[in-house]
Amino acid sequence: MSSLLEQLSSMTIVVADTGDLEAIRTFKPRDATTNPSLILAAAQVPGYQKLIDEALKSSREEIGIRGSFQEVVKEALDQICVVFGKEILKNIPGRVSTEVDARLSFDTQATVEKARKLIRLYNKAGIKNDRVLIKIASTWEGIKAAEVLEREGIHCNLTLLFNFCQAAACAEAGVTLISPFVGRILDWYKANTGIANYPGPEDPGVISVTKIFNYFKSNNYKTEVMGASFRNIEEIVELAGCDLLTISPKLLDQLSNTNVPLEKKLDSLNPKPVGQKIDIDHEKFESMMNSDSMAFEKLDEGIKKFSKAIDDLEIRLLERIAILEEGKSFALSGNAISS
């Protein structure tokens, strides 16, 4: 009998949720996703130091000899995302998702400008727009930024999605893909209800993604649904048939070593009816988010987590560039690093 991973791959596009190139080579997914936490983790692996140094040197050339370490590192944050994305694309046939700085999540214009810059860097590296998804947090401001970018031919992946109103707004904005989270929803319910275990079909995260998937397909939205943030393979099994599922290497390994029959649970050609299209304006969006403690808390937590990962990556890059440039003429006194 085929493994769960092989069976799943026949009905759903499997995406690797990692910046680890070795894991991507092992599991051979079609697409891959990254986020600030994954990039930070990869940046601490000795084998990837060459990629980090490449980005820092390229950033120094871009900023110029008299630019401060801080200016170089700010530039390098974008360069590193693209350097890792470029390497990932060498090992997959599909798309890589690269995330906009989470600290811009409530600034539409800054998000648009950052996304345009990331795409310019990819294009400069010879990579076309159709192989890149720009990840943006599913705030109202982020969704509006994605609407602008999609009109420009820049494809977006709206992440940190926990409430149905976020999904509906994304569909109306015409975004390419959304990443509704499963495991983080489960985490919240386990912590706040006193219920320690939820069977797969009753998992609140599974229920959320299933509703979104059927709503999109019933109403003929083109936006793809990619379930994300899994805690166990039972959640993945319950979403078999979803457009895409982005899965960590640990769970990909479990799927590849489990040999039981897999039933297709979601069918884009025969979706279950879940109601007519709903209009989501800014006021309704904020009202629905504010009345959903889980979604409000998890969106806030996710943005803070990714923002901290960027802060931590900046510190590591400042330390690294100081080592690389120590004693050189452009390591000016004004570049001193403060912790």
From Swiss-Prot:
GO term, biological process aspect, one: pentose-phosphate shunt
Gene: tal
Name of protein: Transaldolase
HAMAP family, per database record: Transaldolase_1
Any one cellular-component term (Gene Ontology): cytoplasm
Subunit structure: Homodimer.
Keyword Transmembrane helix attached: no
UniProt keyword annotations, A-Z: Cytoplasm, Pentose shunt, Schiff base, Transferase
Subcellular location(s) per record: Cytoplasm
The reaction(s) this protein catalyses: D-sedoheptulose 7-phosphate + D-glyceraldehyde 3-phosphate = D-erythrose 4-phosphate + beta-D-fructose 6-phosphate
CDD domains: Transaldolase_TalAB
